[in-house]
Structure formats: structure tokens, C-alpha cells
């Protein structure tokens, strides 16, 4: 029996190790380094209706235990992805999820409609950390009512699995998780980046051109694990969770899984070690063998059970 092979959303995955949207671009760059078919899934860089140039420099700054980025969702547009990139990407035997974003509901729905018809796209990941221009710039993912309406309408558009990548920039992650579950989301991705600011003390001004940026990297690990814990504690296996945030090695991945994640995504680690997803896959197998587990699913949410046993 393959200890990592599993089924989620009606799809069969080789393993629970995915690449996160953004740091892996569209996968083809990394295909020069290793066979993408070894991965559980690839989540491609965010796609909008029209091409976007992104933000002006500076767009990235290193921070203790991570980095801040304000790329501005630079991408060639959904049509270019479908016509030019996807035909090359779908040659690999792995699952492909498209990250979707928009400046308003209409753009989200238009992008989803195109991707729903695209052969080779197995599912959609909804990026709700974007500012809603029709609601004064408030991010979709911070308003449960707005989020519910968006997810509900997206589910009417697509028959493919719809995952919602939740923002940690909220007072209570359960409020937005509840909205997504009620609206019919097939899964939750926890979590997106946390807003931060870095200041150049010599120039006495913010480093990033946009002032704020999204914090990612090892610093995010305990925050992501905490939010996965909260959502799993409420929903258990009723809603699959994909964990992302601070994963650099198999022990980090195990923290996500033990807290309740059914699969994990590797993000920032791809920058400094492109082979990190493959190392995590191999190390997870070795860990399961060493511990005598038949399948990795035995570990999903197990940390919750251990607390009950100890009490």
C-alpha cells in the first residue's frame, strides 16, 4: 500500500505535498530541475482576467525568519495561461489547481468561468485577500458576508473543486471559515500571508513601494498551525483543510497534518531550496515507516486526540 496516496475532492493524489501559489510560478521553470509528476499537486500563480504588471519596486524584503512581498499579483492573464502555459503543464502527471483573484465579484466569476472549461485544470483556489474595489478596498476575505456571497456564486459557476485560501488578517478565523463552509466550499486553504511593514532606518521610510506586504516563511508556522487547529477543532473531517505557512521540512508539514490538514503546500521554501517539496515527500515516507503507520491519514488531526487521551 502506498502510504501517501489518497483521495480528496473526488481526485486521486500521489501524495499530500503541493506547491503553494506564487513562489512556484507556473511550474515550468522548476520543471527544468525535477519531474513535476512527483508532486501531489501544483497551485499556479494567481490569475486575473487581464494581464497585470504588478507593483513597482521594491517588492520583496527579507525579514527575520521570512520575507515580506508585495508583488502585486503580476500575471499574464487567464487566457494566456489557458492557451500557452496549461498545454505544457498538463503533460505532467500531477493535479493542477488554478489560483483565482479579482478586483470585484464580476472578475472572479469571469476567471472561474474560463477555468471551469479548461481541460487540465483539476480545481480552483480562491484568493480572497484582494481588496474589493466596490467595497472601499476592504479585502474579500475579511468580511464574512461578502465572502459568503462570493463563494456561493463561484460554486454556481464551476463544477470543479473550489478551495478558499483564507486570510489570517482577521480577528476570528472561524467567522470566515464558517462563511465558506456555509456557501459550499469544497475545502479551505489555511493560511495566506500576514500583513507587515519593514522600514529602512537609514532612509527613514518603508522599504516596500506599497508600504505593507505579506509575511511568509518560517515565522508563519505557529500562526498557520493555530488557525488549522481552530478550524479542525470545529469541523473535523467534514471540511478538508490544506495547510500552508512556514513549511520548510517534513517536521513542519507534520505539525500542519497533526493539527488537522489533509494536505500541505510548500511556499517560500521553494525560493531557497527548490527541492524542498521532494525532500518533504521522502522524509514523510521515512517517518511513517519509522513510526509504523500504515497511511499518513492516521496522523490527520491526531494531536487533538492525544489531548483527549491525556486528560
Curated annotation (Swiss-Prot):
Substrate binds at residues 45, 69-73, 127, 192-193. One of its GO terms (biological process) is 'de novo' pyrimidine nucleobase biosynthetic process. InterPro entries: Aldolase_TIM (IPR013785), DHO_dehydrogenase (IPR050074), DHOD_1B (IPR033888), Dihydroorotate_DH_1 (IPR024920), Dihydroorotate_DH_1_2 (IPR012135), Dihydroorotate_DH_cat (IPR005720), Dihydroorotate_DH_CS (IPR001295), Dihydroorotate_DH_I (IPR049622). It is an enzyme of class 1 (oxidoreductase). It is found in: Cytoplasm. Its EC number is 1.3.98.1. Its cofactor is FMN. The active site is at 130 (nucleophile). Pathway: Pyrimidine metabolism; UMP biosynthesis via de novo pathway. Pfam families: DHO_dh. GO terms for molecular function: dihydroorotate dehydrogenase (fumarate) activity. Homodimer. Catalyzes the conversion of dihydroorotate to orotate with fumarate as the electron acceptor. This is Putative dihydroorotate dehydrogenase A (fumarate).
